[in-house]
Regions:
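Glycine/serine-rich loop-strand microenvironments at binding/catalytic pocket rims
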Residues: 1-16, 20-23, 105
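Short amphipathic alpha-helical segments
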Residues: 15-45, 81-86
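Intrinsic disorder/low-complexity signal
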Residues: 25, 65, 76, 94-95, ...
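Glycine-rich loops and low-complexity Gly/Arg-rich segments
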Residues: 29-35, 66-71, 87-92
Length: 108
């Protein structure tokens, strides 16, 4: 079975646009490369618009990725370009992201 990764990212409202630009420039091309190589099945970054009360001054996102196996997850996380991006994004976050992953159980 595949592996699903779900992450809730939170950014200070005044840094949200900077994060989106950075993500588009540095992570999206990696996603596209990994997708073409069959190492990502699907991936998305979605602004949270409902479900929980919004935190004042914070913009939250759902990052969802599905990969064939844990090996591709680890390969992405160890990619030098991703590791160059990560500290820049972390500096904009008021707290650690919420991260979950596991073997996909059902899928359509």
């Amino acid at each position: 079975m595949t592996q699903t990764i779900a992450i809730i990212l939170k950014f200070r409202e005044d840094k949200a646009a900077d994060f989106r630009r950075l993500f588009k420039a540095e992570v999206l091309p990696l996603w596209c490369k990994f997708k073409l190589q069959g190492k990502i099945i699907s991936a998305s970054l979605t602004p949270i618009e409902g479900g929980m009360p919004a935190e004042r001054g914070v913009r939250s996102y759902i990052l969802h990725v599905e990969v064939p196996r844990m090996a591709q997850h680890e390969e992405f996380d160890s990619n030098p370009l991703f590791n160059k991006f990560l500290p820049k994004a972390q500096a904009m976050q008021p707290e650690e992201p919420l991260v979950w992953f596991g073997e996909t159980l059902f899928q359509v």
